[in-house]
Amino acid sequence: MPELPEVETVRRGLEPVMVGARILSVDQRRPDLRFPFPDRFPERLAGRRILALGRRAKYLLADLDDGDVLIMHLGMSGSFRVEQAGPAKTLSPRGAPPKNAAHDHVVFTLTSGGRIVYNDPRRFGFMQIAARADLAAHPLFRSLGVEPLGNELSGAALARLFAGKTTSLKAALLDQSLVAGLGNIYVCEALHRAGLSPLRQAGSLTKKSGRPTERANRLADTIREVLEEAVAAGGSSLRDHRQTNGALGYFQHNFRVYDRALHPCPTPGCKGEISRITQGGRSSFFCSMCQK
């Protein structure tokens, strides 16, 4: 499933094409994806100008000029591609699919002549429309925690969120009501860089005074560092993720621990090897020698 860096990569690819453009038409090719499309979905979007394209956790949010927001989620295998107006281009096998490819479920045609195509083989993505004024109270967003990409996440924030929690540090980081948008890959990578075990109690990052420990400060910085590097690399393409130009992300080539069980630990001076355990039904990859 695309995690925050993959969704942010898609947002940055769509933003220069969509923001300021007007939607000429919407070609909705099936009645549902993970959930049914909103009633009169094409009619409600046709003629609307896109004022901004944001992201909250793993959701893309297109602000429209009538006060509504188009909410988009990529699910397991969803992707967007941009087709600019002009002659069709011949693409390599590793490039974007041709026009009207299999599993193209929604096509947004802009007044510029360009097209934004949503492709989703497994159909776990979805799209909804909500009023911007009601978004904070919307069921999808009202329980989301802090954003980890940006200044909202800090050692003090982690100390406040994790105070008194006996759950594992990894489970706490994956709890979307605490930190929104983190997934298994980037939690494993951030914990390794921070030298913290996924099995450590989350509450151990908070002092009795409620202030953050040095570990909390280090972890907050490391999470942001890993996410920023992943976005710069276009995300991680393990199965379905592609950027809006059809290119694959390449952060998977920078993994230190994820999916690297039995490999030597890459931490300088560490003689351990990467272990794989299961936590909450998910694989955790870490080095027991240098992650404490």
Swiss-Prot record:
Example of a GO biological process term: base-excision repair
Co-factor remark: Binds 1 zinc ion per subunit.
One MF annotation (Gene Ontology) recorded for this entry: damaged DNA binding
Span of zinc fingers (FPG-type): 256-292
Subunit-structure text: Monomer.
HAMAP family membership: Fapy_DNA_glycosyl
Protein name as it appears in the record: Formamidopyrimidine-DNA glycosylase
Gene that this sequence comes from: mutM
